[in-house]
Amino acid sequence: ADKEILIRRLSLDLTGLPPTESMVKDFSLVNSDEDYAKFVDKLMSLPSFGEKWASVWLDLARYSDSRGYQKDNGRTIWPYRDWVITSFNKNLSFREFVKKQLAGDLLKNPKDEDYIATGFHRNTMNNDETGTVDEEFRVAAVIDRVNTTWDALHGTSFSCVQCHSHPYDPIKHDEYYKFMAFLNNTRDEDTGDEAPNIRQFKETDIQKLTNFEAKISSLPTEQKTYLNRFVKFLEPRFHAHYADNFIEGALLGGTQIGLRHTGSCRLPNLKTDGVKQLLLQYSSKNPGGVLQIRSGSIDGKIVLKVKLDTTSKGKLLTLKWPESTGRQDYYLEAFNGKLAGKADDVFKIVWFALLPELNLSKNNFEEFLSLINTKTDNFPIYLEMPKDYSRNTFVFKRGNWLVHGDSVQADVPAFMNKFKPEWPRNRLGLANWVVDAANPLFARNVANRFWEQLFGMGIVETLEDFGSQGAKPSHQKLLDYLAYQFIFKYDMKPKALIKEIVCSSTYQQDSKA
């Protein structure tokens, strides 16, 4: 192709922008393959390279600054977008790129950026409408994550297996839910605050956080880790929708436990081994309110009773928890004789947490509570459920989340590469399986998508369907070659594979027939 055409082609494909006047001048001096390769490197070193190629990935990740459904409220998840851009500009290996997005929180000593990377699967829709069932839409989000993992990372339609075995490809109905089990134990629950979030403290509060971290540095590792995680994520905690069996009360707006005079609700199946304190965030507008907790049943033993301070805003309350072990139901009760016969709530509870032994001085504990109350910028991330509250995964008969079949354990489809015994049966193990060199689909899918971006059509034309009903590769050996290079020569670094393609004579030829 003429140089004028080729520089325009390169600039648009690599940076998403037309070439500048100086680029055109510099390219006119390119007279050898070596000069051409250096010019490609120069284009790929520009910040706009990451912005252009990140946009391709962000479409696959269904990135949006809103939550979807009828309200489509805003979502603050731009740090994930910026992380993707930075990853492409830094030429991060797709091994790490995928691992961080699927399981950054499960890496050893994860950094903030590793948590932010897990925003990949927090781009699911979130239903903020009052009266909806949070569990229904949590399940819908998990199903979306399963389908996206296969669409984006394998170029394979997996969604129809939700309802029945695949009619054309060797994927069984129960294998869908075995795969879903990898993704079914994260803390997100379709809550209005989109928890869990990573909290970003403002400049004026960072010193307060740093001072607290220094003060707890001498604590045992387990306690120190717990405190740091709670301040950073406000986890583990229980949201208001954990409560059920309301009497003279209700789940208000899906976000608060509201109990009137003599009202009650159940907190089911709480595990209290090692619990020393109950921490809850509440409001109580009317003076004279009393909170009471019974164990075992609505008529069970009273284990806690406290007169509440009057507050219209969310206030933190800590109560000493009685020695107990095992699992059982607990019941919240509300009393305020002044509200008898009235529709006013005695109190509202947003969330509660069961705290272990923390060994904090009074001053340090007050600082801990102050940091919890500090207003922060919050960004949705992935976090794993505590093991004591891990979910069971079931086959959904005909894809109906309400009709459970057999219980299943996390596994991958039998026709794919084997899941190695040294990998944990969680999202980190799944990420290892995806990027393993033995995976027949991942590298081919990436190479095919890169080719499509540069030529307008993939070697496999059906980008999302590498299955038996998708288009056959137009040049199968070429696709295999690019996948091999990507894995074994380039260590899955995207710039190297893109460079090989744009430096080829095929890419540089004239587009005229």
State where each predicted segment sits:
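Primarily short, surface-exposed interaction patches in extracytoplasmic proteins
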Residues: 1-8, 18-48, 64-108, 218, ...
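Active-site regions of oxyanion-processing enzymes, predominantly non-cytosolic
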Residues: 93-97, 179, 329
